[in-house]
């Protein structure tokens, strides 16, 4: 088992591994321990994932190291964990977009120092003007005096 495969297993509960194994086995018709790449999309959709054709091609390219056209169960687990993390990242980005809209009180597409200070006051945090200034300076990568959504995402990466 590779480090990547061990890491994938550590990310999943025993229950999830069993669920993935049951789905995997349904498509392993000959019991040989692998499934064809063609069946991969069907299995992933059955497990609640929604990979696009392009994502599937990219996943298969990464997972099917020997180019055999088949994927064994350990490779399958690595792939499923990768897809789950990608889906979670998309969801958290949606949640962050919602936060950004709330923080951007005047809806101009930016968070300025005043709005940033308001966020902290509303959360009960006591921050000084110097701390706000420092946060703005750290977050405002293009130095326009305000934080746009991309800058906000970068700031929040450090928080999660």
Swiss-Prot record:
SMART domains: EFh. This is Troponin C, skeletal muscle. GO terms for molecular function: calcium ion binding; troponin T binding. InterPro entries: CALM/Myosin/TropC-like, EF-hand-dom_pair, EF_Hand_1_Ca_BS, EF_hand_dom. Ca(2+) 3 binds at residues 104, 106, 108, 110, 115. The modification N-acetylthreonine is found at residue 2. Keywords: Acetylation, Calcium, Metal-binding, Muscle protein, Repeat. Ca(2+) 2 binds at residues 64, 66, 68, 70, 75. Residues 15-50, 51-86, 91-126, 127-160 form the EF-hand domain. The keyword Repeat applies. It holds the Pfam family EF-hand_7.
């Amino acid at each position: 088992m590779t480090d990547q495969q061990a890491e994938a297993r550590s990310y999943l509960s025993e229950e999830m591994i069993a669920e993935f194994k049951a789905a995997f086995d349904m498509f392993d018709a000959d019991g040989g321990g692998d499934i064809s790449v063609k069946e991969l999309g069907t299995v992933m959709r059955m497990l609640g994932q929604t990979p696009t054709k392009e994502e599937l091609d990219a996943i298969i390219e990464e997972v099917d190291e020997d180019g055999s056209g088949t994927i064994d169960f350990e490779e399958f687990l690595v792939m499923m964990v990768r897809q789950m993390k990608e889906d979670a990242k998309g969801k958290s980005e949606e949640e962050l977009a919602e936060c950004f809209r709330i923080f951007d009180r005047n809806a101009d597409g930016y968070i300025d120092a005043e709005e940033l200070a308001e966020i902290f006051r509303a959360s009960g945090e006591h921050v000084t003007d110097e701390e706000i200034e420092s946060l703005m300076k750290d977050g405002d990568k293009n130095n326009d005096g305000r934080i746009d959504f991309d800058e906000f995402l970068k700031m929040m990466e450090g928080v999660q």
